[in-house]
């Protein structure tokens, strides 16, 4: 359908138009970037194994920071200061989720993630936090598995959440067992990254393949979380996943400045049912426009799904009718 490529062009064009004027790279860093662990030795060690609690904001952010630090040398040929590292999109998206309250407990049964309680806590009931778990743990553990970290594959263990433990994996072995295809895609990305002949566009291709595969593996496991949010926020969550697929299709470059500008167009807080874009008064014009485009994408996707279902039903009914006619004639 012609609308979808057009939508991607409009959205990417909106982000590209906002790129001017960003020169201080330190301003683009995610929240509490400097306070996050920057090397494996910053984590607790037990029996020669690094123990990481990904349900604490700083510890999960540290996983991203270490990946960025360890892969910086491979991106030096594209630009100085690691600005062209296409892994920046992951921590910047995570930082946006934290800053906008999307990692907090949406049920409000606990004070996890709230300023009035444990503001560093990441709630396992958060849809955003659960999907981001896999967008942090799988690339991190694949980096370990592919040799980027310089340690053996059995030297890192992630701690489980307080509930729903079986929904997650915690080390290279268990994640490989649960998500073999996706872990292979992350490994392929890192292996190609380490090649002296790696090209920027091909790196984007491998990265987006791994990214979208990660979401596809896990999106259905957390559909029950939609019930914890307003209809507007749940709609936005579904739209966000669709947007990722289409940004992947055009190989959107998730470098530092571009990813930072991308976040500028995202909603600055959790959506309420009273929010109607483009008329949300505490959103910028850019944020209102982006939300309109995202909502439109979800509506079009639903329409396409409905049409495909109807066509399938027509084909099925026609086939059954033809079979009955053949049986009567024979």
Swiss-Prot record:
Taxonomy of the source species: Eukaryota, Metazoa, Chordata, Craniata, Vertebrata
Name of the protein in its database record: Protein LEG1 homolog
Function noted in UniProt: May be involved in early liver development.
This protein's UniProt keywords: Developmental protein, Glycoprotein, Secreted, Signal
Chief place where the protein resides: secreted
Localization per record: Secreted
Record InterPro entries: Leg1
Family listed: Belongs to the LEG1 family.
UniProt entry tagged with the keyword ATP-binding: no
Domain of life per record: Eukaryota
Positions bearing carbohydrate: 24, 69
Signal peptide: 1-20
One term under GO cellular component: extracellular space
Tissue spec: Detected in saliva and in hypomineralized dental enamel (at protein level).
């Amino acid at each position: 359908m012609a609308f979808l490529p057009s939508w991607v062009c409009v959205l990417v064009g909106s982000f590209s138009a906002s790129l001017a004027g960003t020169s201080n790279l330190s301003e683009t860093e995610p929240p509490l970037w400097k306070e996050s662990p920057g090397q494996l030795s910053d984590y607790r060690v037990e029996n020669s194994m690094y123990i990481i609690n990904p349900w604490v904001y700083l510890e999960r952010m540290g996983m991203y920071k270490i990946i960025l630090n360890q892969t910086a040398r491979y991106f030096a040929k594209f630009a100085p200061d690691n600005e062209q590292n296409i892994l920046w999109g992951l921590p910047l998206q995570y930082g946006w989720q934290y800053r906008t309250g999307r990692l907090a407990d949406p049920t409000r049964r606990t004070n996890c993630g709230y300023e009035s309680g444990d503001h560093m806590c990441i709630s396992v009931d958060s849809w955003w936090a659960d999907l981001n778990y896999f967008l942090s743990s799988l690339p991190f553990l694949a980096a370990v598995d592919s040799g980027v970290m310089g340690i053996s594959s059995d030297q890192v263990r992630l701690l489980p959440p307080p509930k729903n433990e079986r929904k997650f994996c915690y080390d290279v072995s268990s994640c490989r067992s649960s998500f073999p295809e996706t872990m292979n895609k992350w490994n392929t990305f890192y292996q190609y990254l380490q090649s002296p002949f790696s090209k920027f566009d091909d790196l984007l291709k491998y990265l987006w393949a791994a990214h979208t595969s990660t979401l596809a593996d896990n999106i259905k496991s957390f559909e029950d979380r939609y019930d914890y949010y307003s209809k507007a926020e749940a709609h936005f969550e579904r739209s966000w996943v669709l947007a990722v697929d289409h940004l992947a299709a055009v190989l959107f470059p998730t470098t530092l400045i571009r990813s930072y500008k991308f976040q500028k167009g995202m909603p600055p807080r959790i959506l309420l049912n009273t929010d109607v874009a483009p008329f949300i008064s505490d959103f910028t014009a850019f944020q209102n426009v982006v939300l309109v485009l995202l909502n439109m994408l979800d509506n079009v996707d639903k329409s396409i799904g409905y049409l495909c279902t109807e066509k399938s039903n027509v084909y099925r009914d026609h086939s059954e009718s033809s079979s009955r006619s053949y049986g009567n004639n024979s």
